[in-house]
């Protein structure tokens, strides 16, 4: 068959059998080369080059044209994992089509492979973390459930011979900033409860329920060992306890952090660092230090047999992806290039952007606006109104066309008055055009912008420009150029990609107050990848929409909501705190007073919150212990068709040290005006897993539990029943 000479060339054998045979024929130098993220070809054995590092955070990234979906935190706000799976099925279609075309040229470069380093299922424990927008929020169950949808969409059906792609759960583990400390930071005092109850459950779910094929180890140290050299994390927990059989990849440059000056300082040099990482279970390095593995073997720091364990794993993965086999055998290679940025995918991007929008405030039902009356009375303002780059978030692809919020509004109602008014943090307004983006070795991206014009406004200038308009749609917030991965950016409220304050930038706050004081109807469209402190804006703005970084179709989605063609149904996947005073120290990983589960104060907007143009009523829940489900009626009591998200939380009253409540299920329900549906939501015994201090494990314990069912995490929005297991 196909002129095979060796067993590894036989597609009828299992990936593990083929990998073992191929590994046995490789030299130690060849083995070291295939353990790098840019795996070079081994020509004498017919092993093609392979790129382990590709990106698909919310669309195929850094690899030419693709469909750009909303940021992950925005997609989490949809509370719709079925829709999310459709999104990532589209993403994997585009990724496979791109890879097939590239392979046929004879060369597969960086970002063009079949291994995609997503999803990010770290817990967004603090709104100041610049990379929180990559996650699915602050709740472990939400990250697990949405992460499972991502894995299903990317990897394809588990029972097929060949995987569609490989997904990667990252960053393992206990990783969420600060960005500027990640290469030297040590977390050595975390309680077992926080580790197992908060930071690990999503990873466990993706390994044991999702069959995720890759896990990425994080930069920082955990209990004095770098995560990529942690025997406890990578061997004892991940492989021994959870049964993970896949590939561990390192974050980019993480092995260098073992030995470079001013970082972790746990290894003398790259050779020793590489030996430590491989011995701990890190199979593929994003970087170049693993080229020193032959030297490590010669010095007795690691055996070739230990290296073979990793090589067999990664080769088995490549065989499973069909990397060695003819396209005629691999079903996924038939996906045509025409799927890339196709109309169906753009429609899906619009649907997800619509579903992600959260209506935070709607005083006197000012929204939706009329499309036919008084549109000449509307003025659009703000630093994000005409900014296409804002739409893309971070780790983005290149859309064939982006619709800014201004364009979306004009698509809906025709030309409207517009003034940028200010930049994100300054009254000096720069009008820019997008230049090129460049990626550093560690994966950080620099977007170079060319400045076309610059002017400095005063509030008086803006009020004069707005004098003839009664309704101001102010598209503000912050920017993915300021909150992102390890950004070398300094601006008021921002530091190296993280935020130093959650408050809306002062220049925007002052403008909104001035517009309000001038008698304008003010609608704030807040664009951000994280929670923003908006206490003054609840007074100065008549309506507030949280639209995140909404992707290439974001402008159309925002316009659909503003003008009533789509009834908002998004819910917050994070707590919106009132101000900075409610936040613990950023570098403290203790969960005390963090997130809705442990926060003791009164938030501005709670986790799970989101308004609608209609109203809903949730009936009394009934729990059937034997069947393992909750039954509850939901009625649309208003005049608009819409969707409500029924949320199910549990708590253990006897556990006074535990969370106030914990999300364990949710269901999105579509209802016509006046319609009632009875919703059945599974709530099985496994959903009652709870921390047991006597065994230091998460397990289902006998006793009393409260089941809380409603429309947000706020007690006032929940109905409670007690059950005994």
Regions found by a protein language model. Give the residues of each.
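A conserved ligand/cofactor-binding region detector
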Residues: 719
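Glycoside hydrolase catalytic-domain context in secreted enzymes
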Residues: 1-691, 697-715, 724-725
């Amino acid at each position: 068959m196909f002129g095979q000479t060796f067993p590894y060339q036989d597609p009828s054998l299992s990936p593990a059998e083929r990998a073992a045979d191929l590994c046995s024929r490789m030299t130690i130098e060849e083995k070291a080369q295939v353990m790098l993220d840019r795996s070079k070809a081994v020509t004498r054995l017919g092993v093609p080059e392979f790129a382990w590092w590709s990106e698909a955070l919310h669309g195929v990234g850094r690899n030419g044209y693709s469909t750009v979906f909303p940021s992950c935190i925005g997609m989490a706000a949809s509370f719709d994992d079925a829709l999310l799976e459709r999104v990532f099925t589209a993403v994997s279609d585009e990724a496979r089509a791109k890879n097939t075309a590239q392979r046929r040229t004879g060369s597969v470069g960086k970002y063009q492979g079949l291994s995609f380093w997503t999803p990010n299922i770290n817990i967004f424990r603090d709104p100041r973390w610049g990379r929180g927008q990559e996650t699915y929020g602050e709740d472990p169950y939400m990250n697990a459930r949405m992460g499972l949808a991502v894995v299903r969409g990317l990897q394809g059906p588990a029972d097929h011979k060949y995987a569609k792609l490989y997904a990667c759960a990252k960053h393992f583990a206990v990783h969420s900033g600060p960005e500027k400390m990640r290469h030297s930071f040590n977390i050595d005092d975390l309680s077992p409860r926080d580790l197992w109850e908060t930071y690990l459950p999503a990873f466990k779910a993706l390994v044991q329920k999702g069959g995720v094929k890759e896990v990425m180890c994080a930069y920082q140290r955990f209990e004095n060992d770098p995560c990529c050299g942690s025997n406890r994390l990578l061997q004892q927990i991940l492989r021994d306890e959870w049964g993970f059989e896949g590939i561990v990849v390192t974050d980019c440059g993480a092995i260098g952090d073992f030995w470079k000056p001013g970082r972790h300082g746990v290894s003398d040099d790259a050779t020793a660092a590489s030996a430590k990482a491989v011995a701990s279970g890190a199979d593929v390095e994003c970087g170049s230090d693993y080229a020193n593995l032959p030297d490590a073997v010669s010095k007795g720091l690691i055996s070739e047999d230990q290296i073979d364990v990793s090589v067999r794993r990664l080769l088995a993965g490549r065989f499973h992806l069909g990397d060695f086999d003819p396209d005629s055998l691999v079903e996924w290679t038939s996906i045509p290039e025409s799927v890339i940025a196709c109309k169906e995918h753009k429609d899906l991007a619009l649907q997800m952007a619509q579903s992600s929008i959260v209506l935070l405030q709607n005083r006197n039902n000012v929204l939706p606006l009329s499309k036919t009356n008084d549109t000449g009375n509307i003025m659009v303002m703000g630093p994000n109104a005409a900014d296409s780059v804002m739409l893309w978030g971070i780790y983005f692809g290149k859309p064939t066309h982006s619709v800014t919020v201004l364009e979306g509004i004009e698509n809906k109602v025709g030309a409207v008055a517009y003034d940028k008014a200010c930049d994100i943090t300054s009254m000096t307004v720069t009008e820019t055009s997008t230049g090129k983006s460049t990626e550093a070795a560690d994966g950080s991206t620099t977007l170079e912008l060319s400045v076309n014009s610059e002017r400095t406004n005063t509030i008086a200038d803006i009020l004069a420009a707005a004098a003839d308009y009664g309704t101001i749609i102010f598209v503000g917030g912050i920017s993915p150029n300021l909150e992102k991965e390890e950004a070398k950016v300094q601006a008021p409220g921002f530091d190296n990609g993280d935020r130093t304050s959650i408050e809306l930038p002062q220049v925007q706050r002052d403008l909104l107050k001035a517009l309000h004081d001038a008698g304008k109807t003010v609608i704030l469209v807040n664009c951000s990848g994280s929670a923003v402190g908006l206490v003054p804006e609840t007074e100065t703005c008549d309506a507030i929409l949280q639209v995140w970084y909404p992707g290439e179709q974001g402008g159309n989605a925002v316009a659909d909501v503003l003008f009533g063609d789509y009834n908002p149904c998004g819910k917050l996947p994070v707590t919106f705190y009132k101000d900075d005073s409610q936040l613990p120290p950023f570098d403290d990983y203790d969960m005390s007073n963090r997130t809705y589960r442990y926060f003791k104060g009164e938030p501005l907007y709670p986790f799970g919150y989101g308004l609608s143009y209609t109203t809903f009523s949730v009936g009394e829940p009934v729990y059937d212990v034997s069947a393992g489900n909750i039954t509850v009626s939901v009625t649309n009591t208003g005049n608009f068709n819409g969707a409500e998200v029924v949320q199910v939380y549990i708590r253990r009253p006897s556990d006074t040290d535990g969370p106030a409540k914990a999300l364990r299920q949710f269901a999105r329900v579509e209802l016509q005006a006046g319609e009632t549906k009875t919703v059945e939501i599974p709530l099985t015994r496994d959903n009652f897993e709870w921390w047991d201090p006597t065994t230091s494990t998460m397990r289902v314990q006998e006793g009393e539990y409260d089941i809380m069912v409603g429309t947000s995490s706020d007690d006032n929005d929940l109905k409670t029943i007690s059950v005994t297991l």
